[in-house]
Amino acid sequence: MARAILTKELHFEIQNETGLLGQITATLAMSGVYIIHMSAYTVKDKGYFQIITRDNAKAKSALKHLVPKAIERDVIVVEFENKVGTLAPVARLLGSNDIEVQYVYGTSGDGFKIVGVFSTTNNAKAVQIINKESGALGVDSPG
């Protein structure tokens, strides 16, 4: 079965410029902040970041000179087996329980797990449902 945990991500927007990703990640590295998950993209002249770290307070403090307004949001981190089709039952499970997925990002590699970061309309309920019911849908947890 898939495993889900509730955690916090930092979310912020900033004026986009060439080298912005390098500035953000170098600032975090120099401050000793370990990045667990990250999504970054641009729309026109704005850069948007979602970052989960081992110490969000430290990350927020380190970025204050670049990003005066970073907010923490609840998100779900879901780990499940890395094979074709394992995201579909999780998405159906959430939808069938009237939980809307606001956004998701994630990654898989050559290893045995997929990690997805979800924001939903009811994160606490989503975690409970995924942890309780995903095995019945054929979604195995890694390891």
Residue ranges of predicted features:
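A conserved regulatory-domain signal marking ACT and ACT-like small-molecule sensing domains
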Residues: 1-143
